[in-house]
A protein has these predicted regions:
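Non-transmembrane, solvent-exposed regions of membrane trafficking/translocation machinery
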Residues: 1-206, 216
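Conserved actuator
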Residues: 209
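Extended, hydrophilic extramembrane loops/domains of integral membrane proteins
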Residues: 212-251
């Protein structure tokens, strides 16, 4: 059966590609002698000797979706966004512990599709504790279409501000991305651009001026130095490592 053969080959390639991406992420996570092997047709066993923060490791390994850069709609206040969310909640749409967060986000946008401005969607930045439980949700109203994607990004890395030696994330865009990024930053000085992964807002830095050469930096303010450095490392890793070809479910 040709269809079965093609499907099997696609599954095998997806597993192999996932192993490559996971290995890349784990290597950058700083684990010595990790073991990453396929088991059966659709399972990958990952062993990380010495890693104590399992939830953080899961979070970094399991980022699955396409990386997108989307403008935040600054014309709508947070007060208005919360009014919309309260409306959805009264109509039975709220996040229940244990369910997929993407299910909640999809339900919110479906419920509010006649209320939100045309061409906009709601997305959230999540803060989680050591147990992986959501402790804080920050809503953002975003452009429904991405201005840039991870395909436009050449590289991302941790670097340090020359004046105050604060950790930040440096990004280099490819030629196409550099042109688009230059135009976007010129037109949106003072506004926020969200970095979106798997439909979730990972960060929403402010555009401080036109960036014409495809090289940008993301500053991480309002935190301790240790937290800034951790966030810079995590964000650079997410930007650099790319997307997994399949959805991962942790067993």
């Amino acid at each position: 059966d040709l269809t079965k053969k093609v499907t099997t080959e696609i599954e095998e390639q997806s597993v192999k590609r996932s192993i490559e991406v996971i290995r890349n992420r784990i290597d950058e996570f700083g684990v010595t002698e990790p073991e990453i092997v396929s088991q059966g047709k659709d399972r990958i066993v990952v062993q990380l000797p010495g890693v104590k923060d399992i939830e953080r490791a899961k979070e970094l390994i399991g980022k699955t979706a396409k990386l997108e850069f989307k403008m935040v709609n600054s014309d709508v206040s947070m007060q208005q966004i919360n009014i919309w969310l309260d409306k959805a909640k009264k109509e039975g749409v709220e996040f229940n512990k244990g369910e997929r967060f993407s299910k909640y986000v999809n339900a919110v946008n479906e419920n509010l599709k006649n209320d939100l401005p045309v061409g906009n969607v709601l997305a959230f930045e999540r803060k989680v504790n050591a147990k992986g439980e959501v402790t804080q949700l920050t809503p953002y109203l975003l452009s429904a279409t991405a201005n840039l994607t991870g395909d436009d990004l050449e590289d991302a890395r941790v670097q340090f501000d020359q004046q105050q030696n604060q950790p930040q994330v440096g990004m280099n865009f490819k030629s196409r991305g550099a042109k688009i990024f230059g135009d976007i930053t010129a037109e949106n000085v003072g506004k926020l651009m969200a970095i979106v992964l798997d439909g979730n807002v990972y960060s929403a830095p402010r555009i401080n001026g036109k960036i014409p050469n495809g090289r940008a930096s993301i500053t991480l303010g309002g935190q301790s130095y240790a937290n800034q450095l951790k966030e810079a490392k995590d964000l650079a890793l997410v930007l650099r490592a790319g997307a997994l070809p399949v959805q991962l479910d942790f067993l």
